[in-house]
């Protein structure tokens, strides 16, 4: 399955690894990828609306007519429906029971049980009284959709007065509560780390720990950036160990091949596990890992899911550590007048003709410009990120 805005060449990767493979790409009629870009012999099936139940029905029809050996997706929004297809038609890979634990943020917290870093304290919500109780028990709250992604729909409520104000000003919040679609967790003021992992069975093949320069939920007022942690630092070692233990505890035959974990560090240095997704990290995570480790997480996870990739015994860095920055809702960064060698990637996507870039991003990965830089260590990477604002 390929979302209409994706241009990744999954079919080419599979075809190169196994020229005899029969490949079908399910997408929508408005897909950005032209048919001519598909690998030789690839069948393309389109639907009018990729997000609709009709697209899921089309997937089921394909499975019923010619049961595939594997189904590959790389979007959080496709995880559950692909998993349901595997469960319904007996297809190997991530099934719906396990997939639900990666999409429901309450079930998700149970995946962290018994690990060195505990899950952030949280509560299920069904009404306004639950919100008041959560604020009394946990203090400042983050309220978010149980199945959300990209930090959309996230709000921070400081206390009971903020709870009341939010419910009065936005009655739709109560509707969401009554439908059981929201959850609350303690707001942890401090640093947010992310750990990106390539997985094969009970082994973490590659673990790359980083920290965001600003919490992702602040994308409307800040710019989202990320800096790779120094590999020998105590924080990197703890996060790597936690990620490896997380992988080792997954159920047998889980079908997960890539993970994006997020950890919260408060001002005292205490760590909590926040979220985990079984897909490649967004923004420039893939670019950063590829530059430093020489491994494309999307390609590797795709081929692992098809049984067509033999991973190296011990991945070793092929380049220096990296950091990246998105221009979201914060100050405008820019390329220095004399472009330095350490700026390894820069892009500023142009809006469709006749349209201007939106002033307000709609998610944490919605950006007007993207920068990928390299450096010797965290300190140098941070300094070079600051140089991107030197002309501002």
Where do the language-model regions lie?
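ATP-binding N-terminal substructure of ATP-dependent carboxylate-amine bond-forming enzymes
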Residues: 1-98, 308-310, 374-389
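A conserved helix-loop-beta module that forms one wall/lid of the active-site cleft
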Residues: 87-153, 158
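ATP-grasp fold ATP-binding core
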Residues: 112, 135-157, 175-190, 195, ...
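Peripheral (often C-terminal) accessory segments that flank ATP-dependent C-N-forming ligase machineries
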Residues: 114, 131, 302-392
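Conserved ATP-binding module of the ATP-grasp superfamily
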Residues: 118-120, 141-143, 156-190, 220-225, ...
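ATP-dependent carboxylate/phosphate-activation module, predominantly the ATP-grasp catalytic core
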Residues: 186-254, 273, 277-305
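Short acidic-glycine loop/turn motifs at beta-strand connectors
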Residues: 199-204, 266-269, 329-330
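A short glycine-rich, hydrophobically flanked beta-strand micro-motif that places a catalytic Asp/Glu
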Residues: 253-267
